[in-house]
Design a protein with these regions (language model features):
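C-terminal "cap" of GNAT-fold acetyltransferases
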Residues: 124-150
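Conserved N-terminal entry element of GNAT/NAT acetyltransferase domains
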Residues: 1-9, 144, 148-150
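A short, internal acetyl-CoA/4′-phosphopantetheine-binding micro-motif in the GNAT/acyltransferase core
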Residues: 70-77, 106-107
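Conserved acetyl-CoA-binding loop-helix of GNAT-fold acetyltransferases
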Residues: 78-91, 103
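Conserved active-site alpha-helix within GNAT-family acetyltransferase domains
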Residues: 105-131
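Acetyl-CoA-dependent GNAT
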Residues: 8-9, 16-64, 68, 73
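Conserved GNAT acetyl-CoA-binding A-motif
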Residues: 93-106
Length: 150
């Protein structure tokens, strides 16, 4: 088992993981072309050659990034996969000199255990006007905004 930066051949497996969550309305759907375009922002968690988890770090501004598209295969949940993936994003964000990382989530307890705190979505104008306006739930988003200061 290992966490690593995603590569082009991983895109279809990442897409399949994300589709599972999108079909349950737990995250926005991401197209395969979008994943290819942003493959450098993804990490994967691999077990015996199979991708069982993924996450993406989206940079929004000079001091702000988002942990997004966090997905773990059902059989791998509650084993630290998600935590390790988010930790990889936080380490990359620190290395890039970012000061704050946020997430929009339905799993606030998970992020709270990692040191994230609750914030208002209004603190994230770049996200709101770029991604959120495309969401079918906008403006009545039911995800919880959380952030961590690095």
């Amino acid at each position: 088992m290992a966490i690593r930066k995603a590569r082009i051949p991983d895109a279809k497996a990442i897409h399949q993981l994300l589709i599972t969550y999108a079909q349950q309305e737990l995250m926005l759907s991401r197209s395969l072309p979008d994943i290819y375009e942003k493959i450098r922002s993804f990490y994967v968690y691999e077990v015996s050659g199979e991708i069982v988890g993924t996450v993406s770090l989206q940079i929004w501004w000079a001091d702000l990034a988002e942990v997004r598209s966090l997905a773990v295969a059902e059989g791998q949940m509650k084993q630290g996969v998600g935590r390790q993936l988010v930790q990889a994003c936080l380490e990359e964000a620190r290395g890039l000199g970012l000061k704050k990382v946020f997430a929009l989530t339905y799993q606030p307890v998970f992020f709270e255990k990692m040191g994230f705190q609750y914030i208002e979505k209004a603190e994230l104008p770049q996200k709101i006007w770029s991604d959120c306006v495309k969401c079918p739930k906008f403006p009545d988003c039911d995800e919880i905004a959380m952030s961590i200061v690095l």
